[in-house]
From Swiss-Prot:
Domain of life: Bacteria
Cofactor: Mn(2+); Mg(2+)
The protein, known as: Ribonuclease HII
Organism (species): Clostridium botulinum (strain ATCC 19397 / Type A)
Note describing how the cofactor binds: Manganese or magnesium. Binds 1 divalent metal ion per monomer in the absence of substrate. May bind a second metal ion after substrate binding.
């Protein structure tokens, strides 16, 4: 759109153009968008000026996200630019039902800035829709990824601590490439024959750990929704097996299902 005669362009057309910029924006267009913002801010119409202000706010937010993402990539790269680094994380340690799931992800940490995966953070801080969108992008861009699980019966037999370590180990060992380094969230993975560094609050610092957190979360939530189709009385589709009041009352009323962790129900039954 040619904005040289901006005063002659209807507001709705300008808004449609502004919305398109937000949807299709890439950082290479920054200067062009800044010029557009300047023109919008000089318009005599208040609603057009507000479009310019909104576009400027969008650009600032984009730059903040770019900086945050770059910091997460750089955090991993500091271990070695030419290293294959895997991030590994688990989800489902605390639920009363279902498996514990882990994912390991190896990203290309040396891709150009605009080829990086944006908006990645701790999976718990993302909406379900955003997690599912990022899950697809991460899988497409990863050099390798692997998902592993330990089911509820094994958790009962071996205990949650063993199961937690085992699922992380399986996730890493199932990768199609062998990483030079494994970054884990919070604590080290025992009996792993690969160099391992644990990062406190790693899912908010490391791009590799945060990516694995998202893949594990989306995979497990999907599993629990499938289980819910045959066990809808427990509400697995929205509680993911965690001990909500609704879930606890359903266990007391209907008894445990085949996917409940009996060792977690001693105070309920």
């Amino acid at each position: 759109m040619n904005l040289n005669n901006l005063e002659n362009i209807r507001y709705n057309e300008i808004k449609e153009f502004s919305d398109k910029i937000k949807k299709e924006f890439t950082f290479s267009q920054k200067k062009q968008v800044m010029d557009i913002i300047e023109k919008l801010n000089k318009d005599s119409r208040k609603n057009v000026i507000k479009l310019g202000q909104a576009l400027e706010k969008f650009l600032n937010k984009y730059e903040e996200e770019l900086k945050r993402t770059n910091n997460m990539y750089n955090f991993d790269r500091r271990y070695g630019n030419n290293y294959l680094i895997a991030g590994v994380d688990e989800v489902g340690r605390g639920p009363l039902a279902g498996p514990i799931v882990a994912a390991a992800v190896v990203l290309d940490l040396n891709v150009e800035e605009m080829q990086r995966v944006f908006n990645i953070k701790d999976s718990k801080k993302l909406s379900e829709k955003k997690r599912e969108e990022l899950d697809i992008i991460i899988r497409e861009k990863a050099i390798s990824y692997n998902i592993a699980l330990v089911d509820n019966k094994t958790i009962d037999e071996r205990g949650i601590s063993w199961s937690n370590n085992e699922v992380l180990k399986r996730a890493v060992e199932g990768l199609k490439v062998k990483p030079d380094l494994v970054l884990s969230d919070g604590y080290a993975v025992k009996n792993l024959n690969i160099r391992n560094e644990f990062i406190i609050k790693g899912d908010s610092k490391s791009i590799s750990i945060a990516s694995s957190s998202i893949i594990a979360k989306v995979y497990r939530d999907s599993m629990m929704k499938e289980y819910s189709k045959g066990l809808n009385m427990y509400g697995f589709n929205h509680n993911a097996g965690y001990g909500t009041e609704e879930h606890v009352q359903a266990i007391k009323k209907h008894g445990p299902s085949k996917i409940h962790r009996m060792s977690f129900l001693t105070n309920i039954l």
